[in-house]
Amino acid sequence: MSFIKTDDNVKLFYESTGKGEPIIFVHEFAGDYRSWEPQINYLSRYYQCISFCARGYPPSEVPENESSYSQERAWRDILSVMDNLQVEKAHIVGLSMGGFATLHLGINAQDRVLSLVIAGCGYGAIPIDKTNFNKEADFSNISLDSAKIILNKGMD
């Protein structure tokens, strides 16, 4: 198993395969590095494909402190993967939760990105309308229900 350390000293599990221009795959809430297996199986013939488990997703470290988790931490973790693997620039592919991290990386570290592929990143809710957004999305209950299912049944 291969691990890197983030700039705040959290161990992240990663896999890298193939040669060529690097593509980094960032998984969704209910996934992990394996979510990208079909894409990596094909694209690793032509590119260096890197996938990793976000913090909180074993075998990556699961910090207990809530302050260890944020949108900023998520995009900085992508940079930590790049830095540890000596990847100067990469194509970044993110889905859902990983899409948000990918979007934030593109905004905050444009010089490290060759391209962004972002899917399921949200519908662009207006921040001042948080009450209506929460009613529409019911995000906290959906997330809690998903977490309970994963905890009880696992991810396989």
Annotate each predicted stretch with a short phrase.
Residues 19-20, 28-31, 96:
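Active-site glycine-rich loops that stabilize anionic/oxyanionic intermediates
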Residues 28-38, 49:
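Serine-hydrolase catalytic-loop signature spanning alpha/beta hydrolases and amidase-signature enzymes
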Residues 30, 54-58, 123:
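Alpha/beta-hydrolase active-site loop signature
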Residues 103, 107-108, 114-149:
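Flexible "cap/lid" loop of the alpha/beta hydrolase fold
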